[in-house]
């Protein structure tokens, strides 16, 4: 007799509880860019990825409203059937121009972009070389590809080169890395990585989910931040970025050489086997690109707030690695401490999520502090004061 489904998953959930690893959803409504209502209570949030505070921007809301009035609220089909509207076409052209690459392809989600593109680019018999701290969607894309996978230590260029040399017999070699690592906030050394790919005849696939809109001239992302030459970008590099973080809306795009993008149109299963995103989303994103470029004060405020936060965290007993992005980790070690400090902040009306394994390695549970241009200096000071009070409180 097969095991009872309730017993199987009830026991598995109980094991998660024992390890302090069960996650819980909260019912959240945005009040403004920095404040949310979570489980009916207002809280100052350092939890999301709305880095520029654009999710509530009037221009984006109005663009979405007009898009819905013109196109309706659904795409109705795959982009290869009848789900590719004039709004989607215009967005892709504007995204390509924005990042300085020849062509772009819009996906309904960042996870879908990576899970579909990577298996379209490499397959069994190819080599895929991945940073140890890459996001789960890059890891899953690598697994789905069935390429021979090598994982190199985080940002270790010497190890990356050894992996490239070891894979020289492969038909294709693809190096995959986040541009900004989502749980640490540090940057991948893209110029050096691209140089290694040039030297060893490999391609570089970059996920700029947390750099797009925040880094670079006019918010153009990590390629602009590192001043990667345009010719190198189009010949070796495949660029991906999400549009639900700094851009404030939803979806993702991949940009690169025209032949690469056309290949993804034909072979990325998450692109053509899914209904397209609503055209109203594309219109909101077109408005977002204009705001990202024109309202540079948002990036300037982020930089100022990051400096202020670093000064406040220096007074705490826990490590806070230097960050060049809108993400600031506070390393607490064990799951119990991370949950205790999160609860102490929550009691003060501040929401900062505790991040635990398997999202981060064992023994590195942390608070992931996400900054937004919607925050104020007083918000940062309030967070630092609450953390200092929590650090002085003995464990229960």
UniProtKB/Swiss-Prot annotation:
What does the record give as the reaction this protein catalyses? 6-carboxyhexanoyl-[ACP] + L-alanine + H(+) = (8S)-8-amino-7-oxononanoate + holo-[ACP] + CO2
Q: What keywords are annotated for this sequence in UniProt?
A: Biotin biosynthesis, Pyridoxal phosphate, Transferase
Q: Which CDD domains match?
A: KBL_like
> Would you tell me the protein name for this molecule?
8-amino-7-oxononanoate synthase
Taxonomic path: Bacteria, Pseudomonadati, Pseudomonadota, Betaproteobacteria, Burkholderiales
Q: Which sites bind pyridoxal 5'-phosphate?
A: 110-111, 182, 210, 242
EC class, as a word, reads transferase
Q: Which GO terms describe its biological process?
A: biotin biosynthetic process
Question: Which superkingdom, per the lineage?
Answer: Bacteria
EC number per UniProt: 2.3.1.47
Quaternary state and partners of this protein?
Answer: Homodimer.
Residues at which substrate binds: 23, 135, 359
Q: Tell me the PANTHER family matching this sequence.
A: 8-AMINO-7-OXONONANOATE SYNTHASE (PTHR13693:SF100), CLASS II AMINOTRANSFERASE/8-AMINO-7-OXONONANOATE SYNTHASE (PTHR13693)
**Pathway noted in the entry:** Cofactor biosynthesis; biotin biosynthesis
HAMAP family under this entry? BioF_aminotrans_2
Q: Which family does it belong to?
A: Belongs to the class-II pyridoxal-phosphate-dependent aminotransferase family. BioF subfamily.
What's the cofactor? pyridoxal 5'-phosphate
